[in-house]
């Protein structure tokens, strides 16, 4: 018997696709300039591994169960939001090890915002899915 895939699990499948796509973007000719995706986001093997691991984690969560998908969104959302906040303050985040490898990145607030807003936004949506949207499944 085929088990029903919930909306939460569908969101996890979407996140998996999103992160696989982000990894692929870095390898499309014409989208990177001097190692920066769209001329803004520094792309290196650590970023690729982070996004690939995020995608694989989302695939496993979506495939395994609703309960694990909810856990994924709570944990992932917390980690990504915190990474974005750390990046906003210090210029580099911790998930891709940049703060440890390169230290504090001195930049103006608009640059730091452009670099870290995606993690805060994606993490915030994940937190919403994990803590708010998931309530209808309890």
What are these regions (language model features)?
Residues 1-138:
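Membrane-interface extramembranous regions
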């Amino acid at each position: 018997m085929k088990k029903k895939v919930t909306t939460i699990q569908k969101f996890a499948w979407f996140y998996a696709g999103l992160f696989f796509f982000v990894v692929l973007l870095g390898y499309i000719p014409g989208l990177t300039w001097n190692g920066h995706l769209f001329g803004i986001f520094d792309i290196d093997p650590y970023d690729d591994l982070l996004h690939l691991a995020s995608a694989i984690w989302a695939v496993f969560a979506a495939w395994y169960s609703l309960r694990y998908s909810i856990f994924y969104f709570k944990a992932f959302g917390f980690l990504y939001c915190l990474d974005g906040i750390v990046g906003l303050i210090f210029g580099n985040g911790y998930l891709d090890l940049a703060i440890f490898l390169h230290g504090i990145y001195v930049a103006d607030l608009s640059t730091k915002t452009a670099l870290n807003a995606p993690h805060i936004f994606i993490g915030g949506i994940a937190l919403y899915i994990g803590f708010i949207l998931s309530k209808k499944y309890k």
